[in-house]
Amino acid sequence: MSSVTGFYIPPISFFGEGALEETADYIKNKDYKKALIVTDPGIAAIGLSGRVQKMLEERGLNVAIYDKTQPNPNIANVTAGLKVLKEQNSEIVVSIGGGSAHDNAKAIALLATNGGEIGDYEGVNQSKKAALPLFAINTTAGTASEMTRFTIISNEEKKIKMAIIDNNVTPAVAVNDPSTMFGLPPALTAATGLDALTHCIEAYVSTASNPITDACALKGIDLINESLVAAYKDGKDKKARTDMCYAEYLAGMAFNNASLGYVHALAHQLGGFYHLPHGVCNAVLLPHVQEANMQCPKAKKRLGEIALHFGASQEDPEETIKALHVLNRTMNIPRNLKELGVKTEDFEILAEHAMHDACHLTNPVQFTKEQVVAIIKKAYEY
């Protein structure tokens, strides 16, 4: 096996207020003529996609819009967006939103050059050609999809989420302008922020972690610990929103290169089965999966190290677990899977599907099916 480690991030990332204008100028200077904006009904309703459309049109581009992306984008969303792209013969894709819009846009951009069905690319690096250039404008501080090589698309017929992990879907430009997040509701701030925290922790205990991903993960945890609750309490707190932009990006740098674990492997199944918010699923599962991971000595030590970043006086993995539960309660995250409407009769199939999700491969413990079911049961009854 090769000992070479790759490190993947977008070639260019813009941060700070004014990043939207900077991105529009950059696109103009690249001499692109036709763009497809991919977004969701909420972003369209508040006028942000229209604002970006106007910026691009003022710079000489013809712009088409697909604004029907669902919270858990599915195959139909990808197909419909691709149809709009082909009708206009778009050269680039501009995604505006959180993970859902970015994931849908990545899938569209990938199929535009590679053809076939999106399910053909499930797994790791299954494509042969680079996707169309993607400019990912972020409106939440959580998924980091604006800068990763991960795309998650729901197959509603099979009730699963397909994990497409492919270097070719990495956006060309990632954009984090905190002003686009000032209006984010508290519940969404919490869910997306806890998604970012999950990225940090899963990457830090991952079997594929390295010194670079470790540094990103720990700094991400520091910023989240300092600023997430502040952003939750006051959405217009500029410093908190800016810190969370950097935190979620650092989290993305960590998991984009160290990958994830069973929190995400299970959360994908909950989203596929019940259409639940991804960040909320992660938040509920995170302490229980990490508690189970403590049977791995290295993971246990690392979870102890994380406790220091939550303000503990000494390395203690139990303090990390406690801190995660406290953070959930502080931001009114549902206590358990039962409150989310998960059904006990689905435990077995959820576990089976999670064990086929690519994210489980780098979990520090390779659980048996019975152990996965036990984790689900504990998260259900807690």
Curated annotation (Swiss-Prot):
Note on how the cofactor is bound: Zinc. May bind iron when zinc levels are limiting.
Any coiled-coil regions, as ranges: none
Gene3D superfamilies cross-referenced by the UniProt entry: 3.40.50.1970, Dehydroquinate synthase-like - alpha domain
EC number: 1.1.1.1
Subunit (UniProt): Homodimer.
Stored InterPro entries: ADH_Fe/GldA (IPR001670), ADH_Fe_C (IPR056798), ADH_Fe_CS (IPR018211), Alcohol_dehydrogenase_Fe (IPR039697)
Keyword NAD applies: yes
PROSITE patterns: ADH_IRON_1 (PS00913), ADH_IRON_2 (PS00060)
PANTHER family to which the protein is assigned, alphabetical: ALCOHOL DEHYDROGENASE, ALCOHOL DEHYDROGENASE 4
Reaction catalysed by this enzyme: a primary alcohol + NAD(+) = an aldehyde + NADH + H(+); a secondary alcohol + NAD(+) = a ketone + NADH + H(+)
Location of the protein in the cell: Mitochondrion
Miscellaneous note of the record: While ADH4 is expressed at only low levels in laboratory strains, it is often highly expressed in brewing strains.
Protein name: Alcohol dehydrogenase 4
Gene Ontology molecular function terms on file: alcohol dehydrogenase (NAD+) activity; metal ion binding
Induction of expression: Induced by transcription factor ZAP1 in response to zinc deficiency.
Family statement: Belongs to the iron-containing alcohol dehydrogenase family.
Known cofactor(s): Zn(2+); Fe(2+)
Control of this protein's activity: Inhibited by EDTA.
Function field: Reduces acetaldehyde to ethanol during glucose fermentation. Specific for ethanol. Shows drastically reduced activity towards primary alcohols from 4 carbon atoms upward. Isomers of aliphatic alcohol, as well as secondary alcohols and glycerol are not used at all.
Any single GO CC term annotated in Swiss-Prot or TrEMBL for this entry: mitochondrion
One Pfam assignment: Fe-ADH
Record keywords: Metal-binding, Mitochondrion, NAD, Oxidoreductase, Zinc
Residues making up the signal peptide according to the UniProt record: none
